[in-house]
Amino acid sequence: MDMTLESCRRFVEVLASDAPAPGGGGAAALVGAIGTALGNMVGSLTVGKKKYTDVQDEIIALKAKCDDLQKQLLDQVEADDKGFVPLAKAYGIPKDDPNRDKILEEATVTACAVPMHIMELCCEALDCVAVFAAKGSRLAVSDAGCAAVCCKAALQAASLNVFINTKSLKNREVAEDMNRHANVMLNKYCSVADEIFNEVKAGFGQ
Protein backbone atom coordinates (compact mmCIF):
# COMPACT_ATOMS: atom_id res chain seq x y z
CA MET A 1 0.00 0.00 0.00
CA ASP A 2 1.38 3.41 -1.02
CA MET A 3 0.89 5.41 2.16
CA THR A 4 1.32 8.71 0.31
CA LEU A 5 -2.06 8.04 -1.30
CA GLU A 6 -3.72 7.69 2.10
CA SER A 7 -5.08 10.50 4.29
CA CYS A 8 -2.84 12.09 6.92
CA ARG A 9 -5.05 10.51 9.58
CA ARG A 10 -4.67 7.04 8.06
CA PHE A 11 -0.90 7.45 7.71
CA VAL A 12 -0.55 8.32 11.39
CA GLU A 13 -2.80 5.43 12.43
CA VAL A 14 -0.71 2.91 10.48
CA LEU A 15 2.51 4.53 11.72
CA ALA A 16 1.33 3.98 15.30
CA SER A 17 0.45 0.33 14.68
CA ASP A 18 2.65 -2.77 14.75
CA ALA A 19 2.83 -2.79 10.94
CA PRO A 20 6.44 -3.12 9.69
CA ALA A 21 6.06 0.03 7.60
CA PRO A 22 5.91 2.96 7.52
CA GLY A 23 8.52 3.54 10.16
CA GLY A 24 11.17 6.12 10.95
CA GLY A 25 12.42 6.34 7.39
CA GLY A 26 9.00 6.90 5.87
CA ALA A 27 8.14 9.42 8.57
CA ALA A 28 11.41 11.26 7.91
CA ALA A 29 10.64 11.45 4.20
CA LEU A 30 7.17 12.85 4.85
CA VAL A 31 8.44 15.44 7.33
CA GLY A 32 11.12 16.42 4.81
CA ALA A 33 8.50 16.86 2.11
CA ILE A 34 6.42 19.02 4.45
CA GLY A 35 9.45 21.15 5.33
CA THR A 36 10.32 21.56 1.67
CA ALA A 37 6.73 22.52 0.86
CA LEU A 38 6.77 25.15 3.61
CA GLY A 39 9.85 26.71 2.08
CA ASN A 40 8.19 26.51 -1.32
CA MET A 41 5.17 28.32 0.12
CA VAL A 42 7.39 31.23 1.11
CA GLY A 43 8.50 31.34 -2.50
CA SER A 44 4.90 31.30 -3.70
CA LEU A 45 4.12 34.28 -1.46
CA THR A 46 7.15 36.13 -2.85
CA VAL A 47 6.65 35.64 -6.59
CA GLY A 48 4.67 38.44 -8.21
CA LYS A 49 5.21 40.94 -5.41
CA LYS A 50 6.69 44.28 -6.53
CA LYS A 51 8.77 44.52 -3.38
CA TYR A 52 10.69 41.40 -4.41
CA THR A 53 11.10 42.07 -8.13
CA ASP A 54 14.89 41.86 -7.90
CA VAL A 55 14.79 38.26 -6.68
CA GLN A 56 11.90 36.96 -8.81
CA ASP A 57 13.99 34.84 -11.16
CA GLU A 58 15.98 33.27 -8.34
CA ILE A 59 12.85 32.49 -6.32
CA ILE A 60 11.05 31.02 -9.33
CA ALA A 61 14.03 28.73 -10.00
CA LEU A 62 14.13 27.64 -6.36
CA LYS A 63 10.41 26.92 -6.40
CA ALA A 64 10.87 24.64 -9.40
CA LYS A 65 13.63 22.82 -7.54
CA CYS A 66 11.45 22.46 -4.46
CA ASP A 67 8.61 21.07 -6.56
CA ASP A 68 10.97 18.29 -7.61
CA LEU A 69 12.39 17.76 -4.10
CA GLN A 70 8.88 17.48 -2.63
CA LYS A 71 7.98 14.80 -5.15
CA GLN A 72 11.21 12.89 -4.56
CA LEU A 73 10.77 12.99 -0.79
CA LEU A 74 7.20 11.73 -1.04
CA ASP A 75 8.45 8.95 -3.31
CA GLN A 76 10.88 7.94 -0.58
CA VAL A 77 8.00 7.13 1.78
CA GLU A 78 7.08 4.18 -0.42
CA ALA A 79 10.71 3.46 -1.33
CA ASP A 80 11.62 3.09 2.34
CA ASP A 81 8.78 0.63 2.79
CA LYS A 82 10.00 -1.46 -0.16
CA GLY A 83 13.63 -1.19 0.96
CA PHE A 84 12.78 -2.68 4.35
CA VAL A 85 11.03 -5.77 2.96
CA PRO A 86 14.22 -7.65 1.90
CA LEU A 87 15.80 -6.93 5.28
CA ALA A 88 12.78 -8.24 7.17
CA LYS A 89 12.82 -11.38 5.02
CA ALA A 90 16.56 -11.82 5.55
CA TYR A 91 16.15 -11.79 9.33
CA GLY A 92 13.60 -14.54 8.91
CA ILE A 93 16.10 -16.89 7.25
CA PRO A 94 17.15 -19.75 9.59
CA LYS A 95 20.49 -19.06 11.26
CA ASP A 96 21.90 -22.36 10.05
CA ASP A 97 21.35 -21.39 6.40
CA PRO A 98 24.83 -20.92 4.85
CA ASN A 99 23.55 -18.07 2.65
CA ARG A 100 21.97 -16.11 5.51
CA ASP A 101 24.92 -13.83 6.27
CA LYS A 102 25.44 -12.86 2.64
CA ILE A 103 21.74 -12.17 2.05
CA LEU A 104 21.46 -10.23 5.30
CA GLU A 105 24.50 -8.11 4.48
CA GLU A 106 23.16 -7.23 1.03
CA ALA A 107 19.71 -6.43 2.41
CA THR A 108 21.22 -4.22 5.11
CA VAL A 109 23.18 -2.20 2.56
CA THR A 110 20.00 -1.83 0.50
CA ALA A 111 18.09 -0.66 3.57
CA CYS A 112 20.65 2.13 4.07
CA ALA A 113 20.18 3.55 0.59
CA VAL A 114 16.77 5.18 1.02
CA PRO A 115 17.40 7.02 4.32
CA MET A 116 20.74 8.17 2.93
CA HIS A 117 18.94 9.58 -0.10
CA ILE A 118 16.37 11.24 2.17
CA MET A 119 19.26 12.96 3.94
CA GLU A 120 20.68 14.19 0.65
CA LEU A 121 17.30 15.56 -0.43
CA CYS A 122 16.86 17.34 2.91
CA CYS A 123 20.25 18.99 2.48
CA GLU A 124 19.21 20.28 -0.93
CA ALA A 125 15.95 21.50 0.55
CA LEU A 126 17.76 23.38 3.32
CA ASP A 127 19.89 25.16 0.73
CA CYS A 128 16.64 26.41 -0.83
CA VAL A 129 15.06 27.28 2.52
CA ALA A 130 18.09 29.39 3.44
CA VAL A 131 17.46 31.57 0.40
CA PHE A 132 13.71 31.75 1.01
CA ALA A 133 14.41 32.86 4.58
CA ALA A 134 16.90 35.51 3.49
CA LYS A 135 15.18 36.86 0.39
CA GLY A 136 11.56 35.74 0.54
CA SER A 137 8.48 37.56 1.76
CA ARG A 138 8.92 38.92 5.28
CA LEU A 139 5.26 38.12 5.91
CA ALA A 140 6.13 34.42 5.70
CA VAL A 141 9.54 34.41 7.37
CA SER A 142 8.19 32.33 10.27
CA ASP A 143 7.22 29.67 7.73
CA ALA A 144 10.79 29.65 6.44
CA GLY A 145 11.94 29.02 10.00
CA CYS A 146 9.41 26.21 10.36
CA ALA A 147 10.64 24.76 7.07
CA ALA A 148 14.21 24.69 8.37
CA VAL A 149 13.15 22.97 11.59
CA CYS A 150 11.18 20.31 9.70
CA CYS A 151 13.99 19.63 7.25
CA LYS A 152 16.49 19.35 10.10
CA ALA A 153 14.24 16.90 11.93
CA ALA A 154 13.87 14.83 8.77
CA LEU A 155 17.63 14.89 8.21
CA GLN A 156 18.35 13.70 11.74
CA ALA A 157 15.61 11.07 11.70
CA ALA A 158 16.84 9.65 8.41
CA SER A 159 20.40 9.50 9.76
CA LEU A 160 19.32 7.24 12.60
CA ASN A 161 17.85 4.86 10.04
CA VAL A 162 21.25 4.77 8.36
CA PHE A 163 23.20 4.26 11.58
CA ILE A 164 21.05 1.45 12.95
CA ASN A 165 21.80 -0.51 9.78
CA THR A 166 25.49 0.34 9.37
CA LYS A 167 26.09 -0.82 12.94
CA SER A 168 25.20 -4.39 11.97
CA LEU A 169 27.20 -4.54 8.72
CA LYS A 170 30.07 -7.03 8.67
CA ASN A 171 31.92 -5.01 6.05
CA ARG A 172 33.15 -2.20 8.27
CA GLU A 173 34.78 -0.33 5.40
CA VAL A 174 31.41 0.06 3.69
CA ALA A 175 29.75 0.89 7.00
CA GLU A 176 32.26 3.58 7.93
CA ASP A 177 32.05 5.12 4.48
CA MET A 178 28.28 5.45 4.87
CA ASN A 179 28.64 6.77 8.42
CA ARG A 180 31.16 9.34 7.26
CA HIS A 181 28.89 10.58 4.47
CA ALA A 182 25.91 10.79 6.82
CA ASN A 183 27.87 12.66 9.50
CA VAL A 184 29.21 15.19 7.01
CA MET A 185 25.64 16.03 6.03
CA LEU A 186 24.52 16.18 9.65
CA ASN A 187 27.35 18.43 10.76
CA LYS A 188 26.91 20.90 7.91
CA TYR A 189 23.17 21.06 7.51
CA CYS A 190 22.05 20.91 11.13
CA SER A 191 24.11 24.08 11.49
CA VAL A 192 22.46 25.57 8.41
CA ALA A 193 19.02 24.83 9.85
CA ASP A 194 19.95 26.20 13.28
CA GLU A 195 21.27 29.39 11.72
CA ILE A 196 18.02 29.91 9.81
CA PHE A 197 15.95 29.24 12.93
CA ASN A 198 18.02 31.55 15.12
CA GLU A 199 17.95 34.38 12.58
CA VAL A 200 14.19 34.09 12.18
CA LYS A 201 13.72 33.97 15.95
CA ALA A 202 16.00 36.96 16.45
CA GLY A 203 13.92 38.89 13.95
CA PHE A 204 11.02 38.60 16.38
CA GLY A 205 13.14 40.02 19.19
CA GLN A 206 13.58 36.63 20.84
Question: What is the predicted function of each stretch?
Answer:
Residues M3-A21:
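Short, hydrophobic/aliphatic alpha-helical segments
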Residues S17-N40, A140-A158:
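Conserved phosphate/anionic-ligand binding catalytic regions in large, soluble enzymes, centered on
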Residues L30-I34, L62, L69-Q76, A107, ...:
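Amphipathic alpha-helix face/heptad-repeat signature
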Residues M41-T53:
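Transmembrane signal-anchor/signal-peptide helices with a preference for the extracytoplasmic
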Residues K50-K89, M185:
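A structural-propensity feature for long, helix-poor, extended segments
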Residues A79-Y91, A193-Q206:
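Long, charge-rich low-complexity segments
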Residues D80-V149, A153, N165:
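Amphipathic alpha-helical interface segments
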Residues I118, A125-C128, A140-E199, Q206:
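Preference for long, well-ordered alpha-helical segments
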